[in-house]
Amino acid sequence: MELIKGNIASPKGFYADGKHAGLKRKRNDIGWIYSEVPANSAAVYTMNQMQAAPIFVTKDSFKNSAKLQAIIVNSGNANAVTGNQGMLDALSMRAKTAEKLAIPMDTVAVASTGIIGEMLPMDKIMTGIDLLEKQTGNAADFEEAILTTDTFQKQISFQTEIGGKTVTMSGVAKGSGMIHPNMATMLAFITTDAAIPAELLQKLLKIKVDKTFNQITVDGDTSTNDMVVVMANGCAENPLIQEGTADFEKFAAMFQAVTEHLAKSIARDGEGATKLIEVQVKGATKTEDARMIAKKIVSSSLVKTAAFGGDGNWGRIICAIGYSGGRFAPDNITIKIGGIEILNHSSQTIFNQQALDAYLEEEHIVIEVDLHIGLESGTAWGCDLSYEYVKINACYRT
């Protein structure tokens, strides 16, 4: 597997574009991804019960077959909690995109992100779709078009050889605030020219989302609009990937690399964030317990503020473990911060405070927890909680 300098349109047969339609003041705010042939596809969605209209429309596109040829996305307006009119507007976005690209409506996915509760300015949306270019667009413009409070574009591309063919996979994501996925707003789109059955793609997507996107948190809020969509158009002409083969393992490893990079990029770009926090839990009896405990630690406001202030207060970590709901033995917990052991079998150790203080000034903080009761492990990612987070969200609409 090789990291390459690419974009969401790097896999063969894919194109992308983005334009400024006027939903936001300056940046691009509408874009699409297009495959020149129908692609086997898979998707996962937010667990928030107040799901936005685009979620329902995308689910409808998957109803008859798991094939997509385009994804249309707008930012600046979530089209969430907008009633029947919001549903009609999302359907209109799908229909307009299908018409412009001359493809069936049920091969178009729709995604939106932005302010909740306001109606889409459909005149601007329709004009924006008309501006999008089918095969001569700029993928970087698409990457900008999906952003809201993000401070940087999030994308990654890899290549590997499968069955004697070069297979490319690219991913792009947005997310900065309202991030606590079970599947938060977090949008991610993955393209690949691999040939793989849709059913296997869906199974693999669910596994990788559980290990990566569902293990990040910024502020504990789960969005109405979360969506991850992957399209595999087969243009690499590799032999069809089958589960349990060496080719599948190669593809799965590349999939893991893409989703983990995007997840960590979202966590690193948390609103107002100055540090990425990574929590690694091992020694659990179940993977689910390890993941649950890791995520509870990284979700703790007290842990997040301690990270911002450079305070190695392990009491906040042990407290989060205690209410996590995961199984552990209270007398058997070991904690390290930046490799510095500060707790051994639930007793504080003698450690170098100056070294710990210096480490906590770094931009990537790793907390290791060993439960000493099993062999399973799990990782979660988040960010610190700063003054700037409050400022951004207090003034979001203005």
From Swiss-Prot:
The record marks 113-114 as: Involved in the stabilization of negative charge on the oxyanion by the formation of the oxyanion hole. Keywords: Acyltransferase, Amino-acid biosynthesis, Arginine biosynthesis, Autocatalytic cleavage, Cytoplasm, Multifunctional enzyme, Transferase. The active site is at residue 185. The record marks 184-185 as: Cleavage. Substrate binds at residues 148, 174, 185, 271, 393, 398. GO terms for biological process: L-arginine biosynthetic process; ornithine biosynthetic process. It catalyses: N(2)-acetyl-L-ornithine + L-glutamate = N-acetyl-L-glutamate + L-ornithine; L-glutamate + acetyl-CoA = N-acetyl-L-glutamate + CoA + H(+). Pathway: Amino-acid biosynthesis; L-arginine biosynthesis; L-ornithine and N-acetyl-L-glutamate from L-glutamate and N(2)-acetyl-L-ornithine (cyclic): step 1/1; Amino-acid biosynthesis; L-arginine biosynthesis; N(2)-acetyl-L-ornithine from L-glutamate: step 1/4. NCBIfam families: ArgJ (TIGR00120), PRK05388.1 (NF003802). Catalyzes two activities which are involved in the cyclic version of arginine biosynthesis: the synthesis of N-acetylglutamate from glutamate and acetyl-CoA as the acetyl donor, and of ornithine by transacetylation between N(2)-acetylornithine and glutamate. Heterotetramer of two alpha and two beta chains. This is Arginine biosynthesis bifunctional protein ArgJ. It comes from Listeria innocua serovar 6a (strain ATCC BAA-680 / CLIP 11262). The lineage of its organism: Bacteria, Bacillati, Bacillota, Bacilli, Bacillales.
